[in-house]
Amino acid sequence: MKHTALLLLLLCSLTLQAQDAGLKVLDHSDFLIWNTIQDRQIAADGRIVTYRLVPGEGNPTLKIYDATTTATSQIQRVSKSTIDYDGKFIFGLITPHRDSLRALERKKVEKKEWPADTLFITSGVAGSVLRIPNVAEYKYPAKKGDWLAYSIKPQTVPADTTKEKDATKEKKKSKKEIVHLIVRQLSTGLEDTLRNVKEYVWAEKAAMLVAVTASSDSTETAGVAYWSNHEWQYIKKQKAEYAKLSLAMDGNQIAFLGNPDTTKAQVQPWELYYFDFRTDSATSIAAKNKSALPLVSQHAEPRWSEDGKYLFYGRAQMPVIKDTTLLPDEIVDVEIWTTEDKEIYPVQNVKKAQEEKRSYTYVYDTQSKQHTAICSPAWESAVFTPDRNGRFVMVYTDQPYQKESSWTGDARKDLAKVDLLTGAVIPFRKGILTNPRISPGDKFAYGYSDIDSTWWTYQFATGTFSLMKRDGLPSFYDEENDVPTHPNSYGIAGWIKDDQSLILYDRYDMWAWSGEGSKAPVTLTKGREQKLVHRYIKADAEEKFLSPSAPWLIHLKDDTNKSTGYSWFNPSSFSLDSAYVLSDFEHSRQVNKSRSADTYLFTKENFATFPDLQLSGDRLKTSVKISDANPQQKQYAWGSIQLYHWMDWDSVMRTGLLVLPPGFDTLRSYPTIVNFYEKSSDELHNHPTPAPHRSTINYAFYASRGYVIFNPDISYKIGLPGESAYQIVMSGTSSLVNDRIADRENLALQGHSWGGYQIAYILTRTNMFKCAEAGAAVVNMTSAYDGIRWETGKGRQFQYEKEQSRLGKTLWQDPNLYINNSPLFKINKIETPLLLLH
């Protein structure tokens, strides 16, 4: 009671200080008014930027910014918006008021009875806003401007301008949940209507749309129709079920699935249909047969190569037929676990629905009219180039290694290439632990080999497999790895055009590797000496490869003080623009470039600065802030943050984050919350937007209310995770007390999951803290060791042996290791008041 009164008195005095300065103290109700920025977009010419302000509670607002006039307009309650490909129009959906929807929810009104959204269309800040009510959804060609399709409920359909007047009268309402589809040309306002639509899709680069219609009575047509030049044309009128519509990118070819069987047979005879505008109707090109994969899969969506040559689809095995003659009490329902299974039963159970829909990829060559198997039960997965134009495809299987993955956590793979010209499947690597990929030019398969801790390539043309030589070079894997398993790579930037080189990362620099094992990679940057991290930014969303001549946008980060900035790298001269400036902000690595102009959209933030949008028209030399998401922040007492360094008990220099309350007085000590997980110092300049969180505290909130927050970086010793955390947390907290920053009498711990475990362990070793909260803490590693993660079905053993728990041995190899690291067995030593959250 005495301690509680003291803490309340301290908080009251700190609150009064903030009030004396004329500033508010953050309260829980403030979480509701703080905005986040979502769905930012920039037009092709860089003139228009849109984004949504979404409050903690309430209706979102779409903001439209015009870079030419610097004017901003807004539309309330927008849940989704799009700038068309040409950048001339903005459209989206306006939802009913949130309060109205919540009232319907409280009355338990079914969602299908809720009021529909309203479609809006505008040309920009100064343009008028057209509103069309009762819209279910909209779609548009991803890379073709001026066109939009939207669906509405039947009772609100306007007259169809493509039909005779007497045909526009409303027919008897269908019992089916069907919509009417309206295609609109944005520049003219002309609209065409197709009634009773079940499904529709646009071509990506053309004003071409295909739809499935249903008949509500004898006067209407059911089938598949395409729309072009303001006309609808049916390409399949047979009464059947149609699905999985797909258009080639240029709109010149159409594929879809059809099922003419109207019975309820367990096995439905789906067929693949193809249409290329040289015929009057679509024709079946794949159907049920007597092969090992007899069925066309209804679950695999047909997909086109970018050049339209290849059509990829799925075939499937015959499913197990249910015996419908059995009574419910005659059906056996039992789980059988056996050591002979490739995967443990819970994994099988999780995968059951997926396996029932399993399909194997085939390809139809539209030029040769040949079908080629890519995948099979022996090679169940495929990897393609992004455009799928290439002659070669990589396939892989993890089946031989599924059993061992039960205790390793990850399955190794066998790899093979498929030649689409010949259909030949040629294995080229067994038992490699990797995430395989294909270079954009289709010359190499490649990936990072976890076991070898290096990159590999396989040259399709020569059949040569190579591991990258790294003798005498820095590590291309995590230098700070403190987990008893293979370290992760630092990743890649991508490939230079025509697969000339693969651009790799080490801890600080970028390297170019030709992909040939006989050649070592060449360093492109010189960041290691300065501890300056170089990372490539893909600002162009449509970019497939790195240019061999045009400058690359580079994100720079000082690994010591965490300052960041941007620069440009010249790939021709291997030189970095030295005019870069780093500042105490986190400059985002998500940068959006307008497609046809050198205009860039990005954010920068720090503890006190919200990540508002910045727009630059001079290649990021300068920028203008174009949003002001939370102007109310200036009314509140806000803390500050810095790096804190101290010497631990082993005389090793340690680092952590130290958040200080507003008006921090060096002559006073403050109540302190120690909150940590693993390492967080890289987040020095992240902005703590006030918001509730399921597992951690909000730093801005507690700083505003007078707390110091300490977040130490934890470095782990294998086999001693709890003790590692104890020594670093205790030495760091003691240092704060000795520096008279932290009040020795008012210290607290807070953490969740892995952080919760570490807190539970620390409390068995010390009574230094006044109170603690641990969420989802595993306190008994012996019982948790054989647990199951039900979302994946996998066992948890490998998590303790070789992943986050870092014990490094099995329970049977060293049972005391598990006991000593389990707080449960020392719980009698805990005297600190502890709040447990589960």
Regions found by a protein language model. Name each.
Residues S123, Q185, G189, Q614-Q632:
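Short, structured interface segments
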Residues H299, D452, Y490, D499, ...:
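Active-site lining segments that contact anionic ligands and/or coordinate catalytic metals
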Residues F460-F476, G517-K531, S572-S573, D618-T622, ...:
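Active/binding-pocket-proximal capping segment
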Residues D471-V483, D628-N746, Q750-S753:
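Cap/lid segment of the alpha/beta-hydrolase catalytic domain
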Residues T689-H838:
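Active-site-proximal cap/loop segments of hydrolase catalytic domains
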Residues L257, G314, Y396, V418, ...:
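Generic beta-strand/beta-sheet core signal
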Residues M1-G22, V778, G787, G795-Q797:
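Bacterial Sec-dependent N-terminal signal peptides
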Residues L7-L8, A18-Y600, E605-P611:
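Beta-propeller folds
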